A protein has these predicted regions:
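PLP-dependent enzyme catalytic core of the Aspartate aminotransferase-like
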Residues: 60, 64-68, 72, 95, ...
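Conserved PLP-anchoring active-site segment centered on the Schiff-base-forming lysine
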Residues: 119-138
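Short loop-beta-helix segment that forms the pyridoxal 5′-phosphate
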Residues: 80-86, 94-118
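Active-site phosphate-binding strand-loop segment of PLP-dependent enzymes
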Residues: 52, 152, 156-208
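N-terminal "arm"/small-domain region of PLP-dependent enzymes with the aminotransferase-like
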Residues: 11-73, 204
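Active-site C-terminal subdomain of aminotransferase-like
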Residues: 202-205, 212, 217-323, 336
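Conserved PLP-binding catalytic core of the aspartate aminotransferase-like
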Residues: 299-348, 358, 362-363, 370-372
């Protein structure tokens, strides 16, 4: 298609996105990622919309470990893993992840999007079935689409609907249940104990994406397997190094050895993407050492979550129930969520409004993400701003 035809087409499409209020503008941050940041022309704000759950994105111990890894192992690998892109650091990190999740083996990816996108196709054929939660992350949805297996979708965390799908899929050779550990828009946790019970009843594998739950959910923050004590009953975990685990980039799949071995042979994002850079691998190894030494960051995070949620509920806000670090402040109206977020930034609080098509129509909200990097004064300032803006816009009295 020539530029003469294609350019007007894209221009019209972009105009439609803007008219619908769905155009995404990127606000520029000029400081390291942490609780207090500067945006645009030096405006100082408190950040309540990062995935920086354990506050490690600017941790000096991790920064030093990254520098040390570059000194000892270089800047980049210039190769995929199976050619000449595997260093001792990569194998050490895979072992550390396996130890953390109590699994047999682990495979690293450039991102969790790649881990999920490259998971199903190597393991399943058109004789098999994938049963996926309706609110799963886009990366799981795309991974399912790339696979020839028959697809079933059950209502979010609805065990009766999951059982219906499992019954319908009994004619298929193999079945796998796919779910997020924490659903990113509502902050609710998948009921893994019940999911595992149904998997055992109907002879299905279980896969869970721990991206928003690892480091956060569970008595010591080890994720949904710890929360529901289902170690050994979940076959596959996927996750990211880009949220609680330091916030850089990189993803992984961890689970049974034969599954991981098959992914090394046939998972296309693994086979055809560069290895994770040594600096990220070295810092991630140090991060897992830190989490072994102490769970103080997790304790602080959950204290912050409880404090913020309780104060917001007392002020009259509608907050979705949560066991995670995600607090969804429900506003329901799309324009209201945009106006609310803009006014919050004027008060020095950086939050984002989410609305259709990211969430269902009539379910607009501000998604607040708490961090161990937040101090009590940060929380109090954010709560005061929510109350002020909430009263101005008629959300609370």
């Amino acid at each position: 298609m020539s530029e003469r035809v294609h350019k007007p087409f894209l221009t019209k499409e972009l105009a439609g996105i803007k008219e619908a209020g769905l155009y995404k503008n990127e606000r520029i941050i000029t400081t390291p990622q942490k609780a207090d940041i500067k945006v645009n022309a030096g405006e100082e704000v408190l950040n309540f919309c990062a995935n920086n759950y354990l506050g490690l994105s600017n941790n000096q111990r991790l920064i030093q470990a990254a520098k040390d890894a570059m000194d000892s192992h270089g800047f980049g690998m210039s190769s995929v893993r199976f050619i000449c892109g595997t260093q001792d650091l990569h194998k050490q990190l895979e072992a550390a992840i396996s130890d953390y999740f109590k699994t047999e083996d682990t495979i690293l990816y450039a991102a969790c999007f790649d881990a999920n996108g490259g998971l199903f196709e190597p393991l399943l054929t058109d004789e098999d079935a994938i049963i996926s939660d309706a609110l799963n992350h886009a990366s799981i949805i795309d991974g399912v689409r790339l696979c020839k297996a028959k697809r079933y979708r059950y209502a979010n965390a609805d065990m009766a609907d999951l059982e219906r799908c499992l019954q319908e899929a009994q004619a298929q050779r193999h079945r796998i249940i796919a779910t997020d550990g924490v659903f990113s828009m509502d902050g609710n946790v998948a009921p893994m104990d019940k999911i595992c019970e149904l998997a055992e009843k109907y002879d299905a594998l279980v896969m869970v994406d721990e991206s928003h739950s690892a480091g956060v959910v569970g008595p010591t923050g080890h994720g949904v397997a710890e929360q529901y004590d289902v170690y050994g009953r979940v076959d596959i975990f996927t996750g990211t190094l880009g949220k609680a685990f330091g916030g850089a980039m990189g993803g992984f799949t961890t689970g049974r050895k034969e599954i991981i071995d098959m992914l090394r042979q046939r998972s296309r994002p693994y086979l055809f993407s560069n290895s994770v850079a040594p600096a990220i691998v070295g810092a991630s190894l140090e991060m897992f050492k830190m989490l072994k030494e102490s769970d103080a960051l997790h304790t602080k995070l959950m204290d912050n979550v409880t404090y913020f949620r309780d104060k917001m509920l007392a002020a009259g806000f509608d907050i979705k129930p949560t066991q995670s670090a995600i607090c969804a402040v429900m506003l329901y109206d799309a324009k209201l969520s945009q106006d609310f977020a803009a006014k919050m930034q004027e008060e020095g609080i950086y939050v984002t409004g989410f609305y259709y098509p990211v969430v269902p129509k009539g379910q607009a909200r501000i998604r607040v993400q708490l961090s161990a990097g937040h101090e009590r004064e940060h929380l109090d300032k954010a709560i005061a701003a929510f109350i002020k803006v909430g009263k101005e816009l008629g959300v609370i009295k």
